[in-house]
């Protein structure tokens, strides 16, 4: 009997700790994504607007049969000039943060839903074996499914970054120009870019094996990522232009010849994009470290307050004794009385667990402490038999 009670009580306490810890981890991750996205959104907005501007200028130059290769200093100068124009007044600074709400929602949803969908598909197995190809297929399906729902957010975000308009105006323009399907105008390019994201780690591991590299460094991964980004850069620009509603390729042009003389832009934009992603990752990790303890303490205090609200409703041992003696025959009262005392004592000590924050302070659960406390409950429990 004691073993059964110990298991039930331990399971309930661990479940309580797991639920609070899971909520704390989710809140921390969401906070980190939101802050890192807000920190780097102005630079991302500037790069997006420059990509659209260069694509439009290239399309106009094709009509005029004139070409010109931009130098890195020209691109950097355009970035500085565009940033200076928007920093001068309040309206310009607001334009830099246009689309921030959609960016945060999109990043948060993708970072949390893609692993969840992948885990759900993996749990169902789908009659597939655990091979690299099947794992890659599940990753692609997960990303494609989630991005099907987040693509409208990406379209609205880019439109707002380019035009600086509000969400309602942007949505009205899209619906008036292309209908509801306009919200998914760049979904095809998004799917191809999903393939890049899923295949890149596999290619990196294959190259490591091929070259006999025992250790894979960050530099090697960045070089491979830069090569992959350079290959699909034109497609990435096409995605941005489709979302922005800007025509970047003239009639009869092929995707491969869109930026024949703009490789300088390609290389610089790839480097800036990688820098942006590295900064976002580092800032996200830093924010996670800073906010984890704060969120944990907040969740712990919330749990403590909830249990404190329930504590006055706990019956005292004397009230339990009187109630059992009034409603149960004398022959059966003692076992029920012992059980009632035991459960009342267990609930009170459970409140003590939450107040001390067992298992929450380190974003995990202290199984040993919980087990020891459950052992105390069992020792205080009624004797068998």
Curated annotation (Swiss-Prot):
Keywords tagged on the record: Membrane, Mitochondrion, Mitochondrion inner membrane, Repeat, Transmembrane, Transmembrane helix, Transport
Gene Ontology CC: one annotated term: mitochondrial inner membrane
Subcellular location as annotated: Mitochondrion inner membrane
Residue spans crossing the bilayer: 30-47, 132-150, 184-207, 263-279, 294-310
GO molecular function: ADP transmembrane transporter activity
Membrane topology category: Multi-pass membrane protein
SUPFAM superfamilies named among the record's database cross-references: Mitochondrial carrier
InterPro entries per UniProt: Mito/Peroxisomal_Carrier (IPR052217), Mitochondrial_sb/sol_carrier (IPR018108), Mt_carrier_dom_sf (IPR023395)
Domain of life of the native organism: Eukaryota
Residue windows of the Solcar repeats: 24-124, 130-210
Family the UniProt entry places it in: Belongs to the mitochondrial carrier (TC 2.A.29) family.
Function according to Swiss-Prot or TrEMBL: May function as a mitochondrial transporter.
Protein name: Putative mitochondrial carrier protein TRV_02148.2
């Amino acid at each position: 009997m004691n073993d059964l009670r110990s298991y039930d009580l331990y399971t309930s306490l661990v479940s309580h700790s797991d639920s609070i810890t899971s909520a704390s981890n989710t809140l921390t991750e969401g906070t980190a994504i939101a802050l890192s996205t807000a920190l780097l959104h102005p630079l991302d907005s500037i790069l997006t607007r420059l990509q659209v501007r260069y694509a439009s200028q290239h399309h106009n130059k094709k009509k005029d049969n004139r070409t010109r290769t931009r130098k890195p200093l020209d691109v950097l100068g355009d970035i500085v000039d565009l940033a200076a124009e928007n920093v001068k007044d309040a309206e310009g600074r607001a334009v830099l943060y246009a689309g921030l709400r959609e960016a945060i929602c999109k990043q948060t949803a993708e970072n949390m839903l893609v692993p969840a969908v992948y885990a759900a598909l993996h749990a169902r197995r789908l009659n597939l074996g655990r091979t690299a190809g099947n794992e890659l297929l599940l990753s692609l399906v997960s990303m494609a499914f989630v991005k099907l729902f987040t693509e409208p957010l990406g379209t609205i975000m880019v439109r707002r970054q380019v035009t600086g308009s509000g969400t309602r105006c942007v949505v009205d323009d899209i619906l008036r120009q292309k209908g509801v399907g306009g919200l998914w105008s760049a979904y095809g390019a998004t799917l191809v870019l999903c393939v890049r994201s899923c295949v890149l780690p596999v290619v990196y591991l294959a190259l490591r094996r091929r070259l006999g590299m025992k250790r894979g460094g960050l530099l090697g991964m960045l070089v491979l990522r830069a090569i992959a980004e350079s290959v699909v850069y034109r497609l990435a620009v096409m995605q941005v232009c489709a979302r922005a509603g800007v025509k970047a390729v003239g009639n009869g042009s092929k995707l491969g010849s869109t930026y024949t003389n703009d490789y300088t832009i390609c290389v610089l934009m790839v480097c800036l994009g990688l820098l942006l992603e590295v900064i976002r990752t580092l800032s996200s990790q830093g924010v996670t470290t800073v906010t984890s303890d704060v969120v944990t303490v907040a969740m712990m205090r919330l749990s403590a307050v909830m249990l404190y609200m329930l504590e006055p409703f706990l019956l005292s041992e004397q009230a339990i004794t009187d109630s059992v003696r009034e409603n149960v025959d004398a022959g059966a009262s003692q076992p029920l009385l012992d059980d009632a005392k035991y459960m009342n004592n267990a609930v009170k000590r459970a409140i003590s667990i939450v107040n001390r924050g067992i298992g929450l302070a380190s974003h995990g659960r202290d199984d040993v402490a919980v087990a020891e406390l459950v052992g105390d409950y069992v020792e205080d429990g009624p004797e068998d038999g």
